[in-house]
Amino acid sequence: GTCKIDDKDVVMIVIDSSFLGGSMGVVVGEKVTLALELAKRKKIPCICTVSSSGTRLQEGIFSLLQMAKTSFAVRSLKDANIPFITILSNPTTGQIFSSFASLSDIIISEPNAQIGFSSLGEITEFDKNKKDLPHTSETFIQFGQIDKIINRDKIKTNLSLLLDLLYPNHKVNSIKIGKEYLKKNFPYKNPEEIIKLSRNKNRPKARYYLENIFTNFFEIHGDRVSYDDTSIITGIGKISGQSVMIIAQQKSEKNIRRKSSSGSQSGEITPSGFRKATRAINLAELFKIPLVSFVDTPGPALGME
């Protein structure tokens, strides 16, 4: 159905595990599809809250077909440039996670939520050697599959913030640069001074600029393939009332992905980082908002990848 979150209209989908374990039969698949189509017609964001468990198929092949049906509905929503946000509670497994939920533009999860196609109990029953297999939201964010982990009592506040960013009601107009600005003399520094400044460990990094230039910054994580490269920061924020997508290269002394052969740590960009930036660009196109990038990097990470 439809509702308001802080005066912002949205279509709401709620999957409750108390009803047949949150599985997706013909009726559930039809209702989800109709809700996604309603969001497309009304041109308002769609928010889905999921609590499902198990891989059971209530009606055999007809139930299985709902995965494709709902996935096509999400694709149609994306083609119309309508945001789709999903909240994963504990647990979120089975058909729903493996179909439309994992195709969302922004995925938020509760802490320690059990996530995956099969439940951890089913996996350990099939393979006794995988009892310690990480199957939680913390693992999924590390491997780039979800955007944010938020406590339940703070989800509404974050949703309201995100919806405000995705409801751009103000557009910054282009202006002509004045002649007095074009004639301004900027301080000259020779190349040696510039190189020394760039290597100064105490100079401002990307996060400093994000905190001091933009407001309501909502960071998104992961490349949706394999990892979340921390050398690339992506997210949505506001500047002068205009929502923008931000891609910032965080040159730092730490690189969680790897260490150099000398033992020092640096912030080279991995293939995951490039995929993460590409995803942010695609989201900017989807949400119809400008893109702002901060370039500050020692270069790409050299390796087999």
Predicted feature residues:
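Conserved catalytic cores of soluble enzyme domains
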Residues: 53-172, 288-291, 295-305
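Residue-level recognition of alpha-helix initiation/capping sites
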Residues: 30, 91-92, 131-132, 228, ...
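Intrinsically disordered, low-complexity segments enriched in small/flexible residues
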Residues: 1-4, 156-244, 248-253, 265-266
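Generic, ordered loop/turn and secondary-structure boundary motif
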Residues: 6, 20-21, 25, 58, ...
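Catalytic cores of large soluble enzymes that bind and process phosphate-bearing ligands
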Residues: 24, 62, 132, 147, ...
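Cleft-lining beta-strand/loop regions that shape enzyme active-site pockets
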Residues: 4-78, 85, 235, 242-305
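Structural signal for hydrophobic packing residues in well-ordered secondary-structure cores
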Residues: 36, 40, 74, 78, ...
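Charged, alpha-helix-enriched surfaces in structured cytosolic catalytic cores
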Residues: 27, 65, 95, 102, ...
